[in-house]
Amino acid sequence: MFRKIKDRPRFNTHVLDEIAELQHRPTRPPEDFQTKLPAGYTYFGQFIAHDMTRLARSARSPSANPVDTDLLEQLESPELDLRSLYGAGLDDPEVPYDLNTGKFWANHQDGNRIRDIPRDNDGAPRIADGRNDENVILSQLHAALMSVHNQLIDWYGGTSDAYPHARRELTLLYQRVIENDFLRRLLDAKVHRTLFRNSDLSYEGTFLKARRGFAARITVEFVGAAMRFGHSMVRSSYDINERHDLDLDAVSYTHLTLPTSF
């Protein structure tokens, strides 16, 4: 899964000590600091991260930490293919589909509008990636994508034959939003141009793929470090619908609060 790192010291102890010290220094943003990135993009980034990577110990891995990267298994595709939403498709027992229409099914919905992700009798999520129930914003984003899929099913005829077309359309939309909106907001313009014009990425038909001859893979440095910048984007409170100044405890809800509070 991960590329091999050339023989060299894995860690520089001095650098690690400096990083550890930085984590304990109190910081305060400037009084006039105003981010230009809307709050919801933090959680769209979390959704993307879940869609790209999910690591697990292989059967050969000992229980002790740290785990050698060669003994980790990647359970998701890094190709932005919405497996975290669709799972293995209509036959996936973890994802409740209406097999007659190819639509997602949920406990709380008005027509195609799904108000909460599907749950079992104990409130546990019934979705392809349970990590998308970590907070109410991410959970609602997952539910919104389910709703869009259901609307696309109607657009393509309203039967299970429409499922692959709706899935393809939503995946394409998702990839275009990542390229033309999300990453344009996060990356320097030169970096964005290099990534999409001068790299190993290309559009194969309509989908973003690694160029032929290149394997789609993610480095351990990206998964374990570079991608984690999103944690610093979390805000101390959020406004959600008519609720204002919800702290992080409220955003990291239990399912029992959702139907009456949001």
Please describe what each predicted stretch is:
Residues 167-253:
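Extended amphipathic alpha-helical segments with heptad-repeat/coiled-coil character used for oligomerization
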Residues 1-87, 91-97, 107-111:
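Carbohydrate-associated surface elements
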